[in-house]
């Protein structure tokens, strides 16, 4: 008996006007995720996934390229306004916000959500190079 071919259903692109850009800027990489207000991910991009490897991942330019790639993916959703949440101490913090602004989004709010311990775990020992 022949199997009927399975057809992939075409996903309907929902229209989202307001979104949230989550920027995770570590010392080694930058991850940009754009979600809707409820937290459902629309698109994401990283500096490493944008073609930068090794120490070049941790540059502001790599973070800028990752933000531009993420912005291009989100254009088809009709996104206009962005709220930016930045986490981490990395070098790609400011350049990512500048790239999102240059991509044509109206940035309504910038929030720093870097987790700060209230004297939690003991930090790692200092590096001796």
Curated annotation (Swiss-Prot):
Quote the Pfam families the UniProt record gives: Ribosomal_S11
Q: Name one GO cellular component term.
A: ribonucleoprotein complex
What biological processes does GO assign it? translation
| Taxonomic superkingdom | Bacteria
Looking up SUPFAM superfamilies in the UniProt record yields: Translational machinery components
GO molecular function annotations of the record: rRNA binding; structural constituent of ribosome
The family line of this record is: Belongs to the universal ribosomal protein uS11 family.
This protein's name: Small ribosomal subunit protein uS11
